[in-house]
């Protein structure tokens, strides 16, 4: 069974030394319910709202450039508060077409930004400047320059940012990174992060489509170019799918910015690189035959860190992130975890195939839970009943935690308990501590996503990177690469480039 984003948000169950920032909340707000406004009301935002409605907040504003979505969001809030009067009062949620009206409201404490990627940075920075704490969907930014500005803005205005890298709220990811950070598999040589390839070039758009009334398409395009309306990019109204703007260079970064922002984020966490990053990018050694992607490679780029560890963009696996160490292997994905211990994990073809079922000569299988019933049934036919399999993700995590005494480990990572990512954000907005996916964490993950993306965009380019200054070294062209969109069109439209 695959774990959806929505169920993951609702179900994941805060220890660790917190980072503290002044919140600026009024005393009554700090002790009571906070007011939150939503910017964007697409599929992901609706999943988030389902969680936030159960938190200690009042949903008072819904903004979307699509009238149907906006009105549906307000109706949902009113219906929820009608059915749950202890949670809030119906009739208090107002709809907006322009997000600037939401962040201008003095009575709103928090905003949730769940718009297409090209809008994230500007809306986040403007909300921070107006005194709001921000929950922003991943990737936190569309470009490297934007990532630097979001970090700067969060510090300057003393407000909290929680990036929607919700895997950090999952017990399996926390356990995997605790094992890795505390040396359970020795020195890390390689991290494989498995996700899709870069976006498509926007040189082959669909024929212009007639647009039904009720959508401000100019505002949807925002900082990006004003392309003809395309329902493939943004279907009208309420729907359950994820639109194809994720696959368009003008508005996103394909799988690199989408799932790379999850699985490489876990790689950064496991490597202890939340406040740093790689020093070099090694390009992929092949190119695709896909003209719509500009013949770009879809995986294979490598990030090299100062200690010699490498994070590689893998081509696909049951596991989202795989750590290969000198004394073992740790694999993790949503709702699943596995660990082998005893000798060096060698990422050859045989090993990469075997981690799907998990049998290695000379290695102890510490825990193994795959959570794919059909997959495991097929493996059982081939390999037998696999009695070492654990009964659940939680059981597998507990076995590994006991085996390596993680409760007493020297390095203790921030752990979210109950309510998941949104609850962590609300708690931190109230008490002034920093959440698990704070601004710098999300920004640095966005940066490595764009380093990988940049390598593909430039025909498998390799270059050096300074993770202290966040600047390109040898092989990099700062102006084009840092702002990115300037190389695609004339620049950010309508002044929508973040200004701190």
Q: Residue spans of the language-model regions?
A:
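N-terminal glycine-/serine-/threonine-rich beta1-alpha1-beta2 phosphate-ribose binding loop
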Residues: 1-133, 145-160
């Amino acid at each position: 069974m695959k774990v959806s984003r929505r169920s993951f948000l609702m179900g994941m169950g805060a220890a660790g030394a917190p980072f503290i920032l002044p919140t600026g909340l009024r005393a009554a707000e700090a002790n009571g319910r906070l007011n939150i406004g939503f910017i964007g009301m697409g599929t992901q935002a609706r999943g988030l709202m389902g969680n936030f409605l159960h938190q200690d907040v009042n949903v008072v504003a819904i903004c979307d450039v699509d009238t149907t979505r906006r009105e549906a969001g307000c109706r949902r809030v009113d219906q929820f508060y009608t059915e749950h009067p202890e949670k809030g009062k119906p009739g208090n949620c107002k709809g907006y077409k322009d997000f600037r009206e939401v962040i201008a409201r003095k009575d709103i404490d928090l905003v949730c930004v769940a718009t297409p990627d090209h809008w994230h940075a500007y809306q986040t920075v403007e909300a921070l400047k107006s005194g709001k704490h921000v929950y922003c969907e991943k990737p936190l930014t569309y470009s490297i320059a934007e990532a630097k500005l979001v970090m700067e803005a969060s510090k300057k205005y003393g407000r909290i940012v929680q990036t929607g890298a919700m895997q950090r709220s999952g017990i399996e990811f926390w356990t995997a990174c605790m094992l890795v950070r505390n040396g359970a598999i020795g020195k890390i040589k390689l991290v494989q992060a498995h996700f899709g390839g870069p976006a498509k070039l926007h040189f082959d758009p669909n024929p212009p489509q007639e647009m039904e009334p009720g959508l401000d398409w100019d505002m949807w395009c925002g900082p990006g170019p004003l392309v003809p309306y395309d329902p493939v990019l943004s279907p009208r109204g309420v729907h359950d799918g994820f639109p194809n703007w994720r696959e368009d260079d003008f508005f996103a970064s394909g799988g690199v910015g989408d799932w790379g922002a999850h699985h490489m984020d876990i790689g950064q966490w496991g490597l202890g690189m939340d406040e740093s990053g790689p020093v070099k990018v090694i390009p992929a050694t092949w190119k695709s035959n896909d003209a719509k992607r500009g013949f770009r490679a879809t995986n294979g780029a490598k990030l090299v860190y100062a200690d010699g560890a490498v994070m590689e963009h893998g081509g696909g696996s049951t596991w989202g992130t795989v750590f290969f160490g000198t004394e073992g292997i740790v694999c993790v994905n949503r709702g699943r975890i596995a660990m082998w211990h005893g000798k060096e994990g060698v990422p050859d073809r045989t090993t990469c195939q075997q981690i799907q079922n998990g049998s290695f000569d000379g290695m102890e299988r510490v825990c193994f839970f795959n959570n794919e019933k059909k997959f495991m049934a097929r493996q059982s036919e081939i390999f037998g009943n696999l009695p070492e399999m654990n009964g659940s993700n939680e059981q597998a995590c507990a076995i590994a935690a006991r085996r390596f005494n993680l409760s007493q480990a020297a390095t203790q990572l921030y752990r979210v308990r109950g309510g998941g990512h949104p609850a962590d954000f609300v708690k931190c907005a109230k008490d002034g501590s920093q959440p698990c996916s704070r601004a710098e964490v999300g920004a640095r993950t966005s940066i490595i996503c764009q380093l990988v993306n940049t390598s593909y965009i430039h025909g498998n380019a390799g270059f050096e990177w300074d993770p202290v200054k966040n600047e390109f070294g040898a092989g990099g062209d700062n102006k084009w690469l840092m702002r990115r969109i300037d190389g695609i069109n004339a620049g950010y439209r309508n002044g929508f480039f973040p200004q701190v």
